[in-house]
Amino acid sequence: MAAISTCQTVIPLPIPVFFNQQFPTLVDICARWQLVFDADAPFELRFESDTLTLHKRDEPKLDGIMVDFVTGAVAHRRKFGGGRGQSIAKAVGLKQGVTPKVVDGTAGLGRDAFVLASLGCTVTMVERHPVVAALLEDGLRRAYQDAEIGDWMRERMQLFHGSSLEALAKLEQEVDVVYLDPMYPHRDKSALVKKEMRVFQTLVGADLDADGLLAPAMALASKRVVVKRPDYAEDLAGVKPSMVIETKKNRFDVYVKSAMK
């Protein structure tokens, strides 16, 4: 049995999922990402309306999770989200004449990576969980085909077919910024976690080894590392950042190595 790892946590491969074995597209996707059919698996992958979706089988009323860079909330933010004035843009050092090359080391569903790409950054996404990586790949496929955003998406946004920053460091050209948004356990007192996040956390779990991400991120980035954290979370790995950019519910801890030029 193969395994993929980032820091200490190891995800054993292949990953069990439920899917229609008579659907060639699904069979191909699952084979590519080492996902194997299991009649008792808690999650199902479906391919409907040219879109790969993930479903939690014991909560059939929940909508499927998919990656969509073309419509919905991400499209609205791209058009009306504040451009380079956004906190995330300031955190990665976007400014006039400076458009950094970014590695998103915890890509998830790709939303922050998409924001940065839409603002001009070249973004390489790293996602260690194969199911999430499959969703990302499908979202990119549809975005690349879109008449409005396809051209610049193909130029600026890609998925690294590997599971760790260490693996990426062996292949990647110079990286200006590494961006990290580790999954953080929600407070029991917090408002109901969004349905999507609940499904996502059940699949992936909290990044209990997140502290181990900082060192390889610092080794890979030439300019800075940016860590997105809930406002109540401690510093990653207990290391004090060079500066902090605060938002309503989160903050961006910035670890500066050299000036952005």
From Swiss-Prot:
* Family in the record: Belongs to the methyltransferase superfamily. RsmJ family.
Could you tell me which HAMAP family the record lists for this protein? 16SrRNA_methyltr_J
- Write down the chemical reaction(s) this protein catalyses: guanosine(1516) in 16S rRNA + S-adenosyl-L-methionine = N(2)-methylguanosine(1516) in 16S rRNA + S-adenosyl-L-homocysteine + H(+)
Q: Which domain of life is it from?
A: Bacteria
UniProt enzyme class: transferase
Q: Which residues bind S-adenosyl-L-methionine?
A: R111, D112, E127, R128, S163, S164, D181
Q: Does the keyword Methyltransferase apply?
A: yes
- Please give the Gene Ontology molecular function terms for this protein: rRNA (guanine-N2-)-methyltransferase activity
Extract the InterPro entries matched here: 16SrRNA_methylTrfase_J (IPR007536), SAM-dependent_MTases_sf (IPR029063)
Look up and give the organism this protein is from. Answer: Shewanella sp. (strain MR-4)
Keyword entries, A-Z: Cytoplasm, Methyltransferase, rRNA processing, S-adenosyl-L-methionine, Transferase
Which SUPFAM superfamilies has this protein been placed in? Answer: S-adenosyl-L-methionine-dependent methyltransferases
Which Pfam families does the annotation name?
SAM_MT (PF04445)
Role description: Specifically methylates the guanosine in position 1516 of 16S rRNA.
Put simply, this protein is called: Ribosomal RNA small subunit methyltransferase J
Q: What are its GO cellular component terms?
A: cytoplasm
Quote the subcellular location field of this record: Cytoplasm
E.C. number, please?
Answer: 2.1.1.242
